Structures are given as C-alpha cells and as structure tokens.
C-alpha cells in the first residue's frame, strides 16, 4: 500500500514493467493458483518461465514479467505470499516509488472472494479430533467429520452450499437440542431472537425433525440483512473469522455434535450456529454490530485483534441485555447451551455492565461456565461503545465497506477519502430530498 509523496501526486495508476521471482512448492495446481491471482487482478503477463529451484530440490522458481501499476502490485503481493515464497521483486524506475507506511500492516482481504485464501486455515478440530473429544473413538463419526471437512475445504466464493442428507442419528441429536432449548427461549431469549425464530421455521425449515440447510439459511439472511453463510471445517483464527464479518459473511460449521451427549459440545457445531447465531444475524441492528467488529479488525495488530475477538466473545457469544426491566440473552453460546442458558439468568451468575475496555481483559472460558457475563442496555448501546473502542485501534488508514462491489475501501489518502465523502454526500442528498417531499405532502 502506497502513501502520497511529498508533491501530493497519486502515482497508483502509473504503469511499469515489473519482474517477480517466486518459488512454488511441488504440489498439484500450484502454478495455476499463482497465475490465477494475476488474472483476477487484471495484470498483463509479458513473459513467464520456470526452472528447478537452486535453493530446494522440491521447489520450482517462476520468473514473471508483467505490465502493472503500483496499486495492482500492492494487491497481488500479499496474495502471492499466501501461496508461494516471493524471492525477488524488480521494480524499475518508471514505476514510481513512494513511502510505504503500510508495509508492516498484516494482510487482510480486500474483496469478498479473498476469503477463499483464509477460510481453510482451520486451527482446531475440522476432521481431526482430540483424544478427549466425545467422538474420538467413533470411527463412523470420524469419517462423517472428514466428509464435512472436505466439503468446506473445497468450497469457493460464489458456490452454492452443498445440501446435506443428514443421518437419522444426526436429526435425532438436533431434535433433542431444538426441543429442550425451545422450552427456555420464551423466558430467556431477547425479543429480537424471539421475533426471528418463527421466520426461520417458516422459511428455512427450523423443526424438531429437520436440520436446516445452510444454503436456505444463507439466502434468507441475504434478504434480511445482507449476511451470507460460508461453510467452514472448524475453528478459524480470530483474525480470519472477524475478517469474514467485515464482508457480512458468517463462517459456519455444517457437522452435528456427537450423539453420545447432545447437550454438550467442545466446539461450535451446526446446532450452535443455527440456533445460537442465525436468528440474530437476521436482525439489522445486530448484523451491523457484528460487521463493525469485523471492520475494526482489518489490518489491526495481533494484540488489537485479540481484544476485539474477546469483546465479540462476551457480546455475540455470551452477551446479556436489558429488556422491560429484566435480563435477557442474546449471546449465541448461551442460546445454544441449555445448562449455561439457565445459569446465566439464575441470579447466581456474576454480571457487569458491558465496557469494551474491561471485557477485552476478561478470560474466555471454553469448557466451563463464564466467570462473568456482560450486560448491554441494548444492541445500539453495545454498538456505540464498540465504535468508541474501535477509534483506539492504531492503523495508518480507515476502512469502509462497499456493498455494491462487496469490497473494502481503504481510506489512506486524500483521493480515497474524498471519494468516500462524495458517496456519503449523495446519500445525504437522497435523504434531504425525501424529507423535502414529505414536508410538502404531510399526509403521506
């Protein structure tokens, strides 16, 4: 990423010939993946050749001459690094060099299809299970998990989510969870959750005898809030997961927990995702709250991402709110756990007002009840507090989501900021025009 030079001229569109040398691992399709990056970013290749690497016998080195501008080079460089080892970049004088204040900024997706590069970096579980996992000794369950993992790993942006023929055992497990949780929702869940759950039953097949299909749920959410579902094999890193939220994409597991203990899972399964998260992702205010946490994480330091992820944990996963003078639950981890849902509103749980500066320092517990739960006055209250907290994130740029192109606008110079202001000015003109029309016809 390139900043303006001292003359305040924008050279990002000036073109030049650049030679890149990168090494490929000896794997099927490695070169195709690398060349696709150039194609998708509209970079013209002038010459390409390959040779056996002199550094390692198992790798090949690729020489590429291309006609490229500085902005394109900034876009493809981190993408290449995710698939290859970039050994050399020869940038001639005619491609203007400018001070790069963003060299140390961690890579983040700029367009929604970039999520293909990070959605498969599963940290935990997936097709592999720990020895203490309920399904570790069940070979049939392990094969089933491998099947779901392969589906998620092969998924690319734009693909329809594969429809699943769930087994009788999986449907029974889902049914037990669905039935028991629905006994608690009327007295424990927030009103927004209760408003959306019947719609999911009507349009997505939320029933005791049916596990909803992620494709149906994704289409429903797109119409409600612009969110979509992307299948994932298991736990992602906080950075990769939050990056998806910035694009209103929710990474969602498709497997069902082991049937030996329907009321417990050491990991997020599709029961947790569908019953815990989805009803509130259909709520506009909550959807915006989730996206803003994701946007704040883009390009942030590891320390900041961890703080944002912890705030997400104590709101989106385990958050409480006040409604009609009573505590109600909006956290997905609670809304998908019978025992902890009861505990959180039992009067015995420790609760504190939600403050991001406090919540981000609280330890997140995975296999036991939380030591403390944080209470927000409303989604809007939580959103405003997170906005103030996001202002403390140290980045040499701002970001803005463009819903038309499903891409991130990086606001880092006068040109990009002016462009964003012009878009806002147009939106304000539309609103002002509407106000003027309404004032002329007050009965409308």
UniProtKB/Swiss-Prot annotation:
It is an enzyme of class 1 (oxidoreductase). Signal peptide: none annotated. Keywords: Iron, Metal-binding, Monooxygenase, Oxidoreductase, Phosphoprotein, Serotonin biosynthesis, Ubl conjugation. Ubiquitinated, leading to its degradation by the proteasome. Ubiquitinated is triggered by phosphorylation. Phosphorylated; triggering degradation by the proteasome. It comes from the Eukaryota. GO terms for molecular function: iron ion binding; tryptophan 5-monooxygenase activity. The modification Phosphoserine is found at residue 58. L-tryptophan binds at residues 235, 257, 265, 336, 366. Residues 19-94 form the ACT domain. Pfam families: ACT, Biopterin_H. It catalyses: (6R)-L-erythro-5,6,7,8-tetrahydrobiopterin + L-tryptophan + O2 = 5-hydroxy-L-tryptophan + (4aS,6R)-4a-hydroxy-L-erythro-5,6,7,8-tetrahydrobiopterin. Its cofactor is Fe(2+). Pathway: Aromatic compound metabolism; serotonin biosynthesis; serotonin from L-tryptophan: step 1/2. One of its GO terms (cellular component) is cytoplasm. The keyword Iron applies. GO terms for biological process: bone remodeling; circadian rhythm; mammary gland alveolus development; negative regulation of ossification; platelet degranulation; positive regulation of fat cell differentiation; regulation of hemostasis; response to immobilization stress. PANTHER family: AROMATIC AMINO ACID HYDROXYLASE (PTHR11473), TRYPTOPHAN 5-HYDROXYLASE 1 (PTHR11473:SF23). Homotetramer. Interacts with DNAJC12. Belongs to the biopterin-dependent aromatic amino acid hydroxylase family. This is Tryptophan 5-hydroxylase 1. It comes from Rattus norvegicus. The gene is Tph1.
């Amino acid at each position: 990423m390139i900043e303006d030079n001292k003359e305040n001229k924008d050279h990002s569109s000036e073109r030049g010939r650049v030679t890149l040398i990168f090494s490929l691992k000896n794997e099927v399709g490695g070169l195709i993946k690398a060349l696709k990056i150039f194609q998708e970013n509209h970079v013209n290749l002038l010459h390409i050749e390959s040779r056996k690497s002199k550094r390692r016998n198992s790798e090949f080195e690729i020489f590429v001459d291309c006609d490229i501008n500085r902005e394109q080079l900034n876009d493809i460089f981190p993408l290449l690094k995710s698939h290859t080892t970039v050994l050399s970049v020869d940038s001639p004088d005619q491609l203007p060099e400018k001070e790069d204040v963003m060299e140390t900024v961690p890579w983040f997706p700029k367009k929604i299809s970039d999520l293909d590069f990070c959605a498969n970096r599963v940290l935990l579980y997936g097709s592999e299970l720990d020895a203490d996992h309920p399904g570790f000794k069940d070979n049939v369950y392990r094969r089933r998990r491998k099947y779901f993992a392969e589906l998620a790993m092969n998924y690319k942006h734009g693909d329809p989510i594969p429809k699943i023929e769930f087994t009788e055992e999986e449907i029974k497990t889902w049914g037990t969870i669905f039935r028991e949780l629905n006994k608690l929702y009327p007295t424990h869940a927030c009103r927004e959750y209760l408003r959306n759950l019947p719609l999911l039953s009507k349009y997505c097949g939320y029933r005791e005898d049916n596990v909803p299909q992620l494709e149906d749920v994704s289409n429903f959410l797109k119409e409600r809030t612009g969110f979509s579902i992307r299948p994932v094999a298991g736990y992602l890193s906080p950075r990769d997961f939050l990056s998806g939220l910035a694009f209103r994409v929710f990474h969602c597991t498709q497997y069902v927990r082991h049937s030996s203990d329907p009321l417990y899972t050491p990991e997020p399964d599709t029961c947790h995702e569908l019953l815990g998260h989805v009803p509130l992702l259909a709520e506009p205010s909550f959807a915006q709250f989730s996206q803003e946490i994701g946007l704040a994480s883009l390009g942030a330091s590891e320390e900041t991402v961890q703080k944002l992820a912890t705030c997400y944990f104590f709101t989106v996963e385990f958050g409480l709110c006040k409604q009609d003078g009573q505590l109600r639950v909006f956290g997905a981890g609670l809304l998908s756990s019978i025992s902890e849902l009861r505990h959180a509103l039992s009067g015995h749980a420790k609760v504190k007002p939600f403050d991001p500066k406090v919540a981000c320092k609280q330890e997140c517990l995975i296999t036991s009840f939380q030591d403390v739960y944080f209470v927000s006055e409303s989604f809007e209250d939580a959103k405003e507090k997170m906005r103030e907290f996001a202002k403390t994130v140290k980045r040499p740029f701002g970001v803005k989501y463009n819903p038309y192109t499903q891409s991130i606008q990086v606001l880092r110079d006068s040109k990009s900021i002016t462009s964003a202001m012009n878009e806002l000015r147009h939106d304000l003109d539309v609103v002002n025009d509407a106000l003027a029309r309404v004032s002329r016809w007050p009965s409308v």
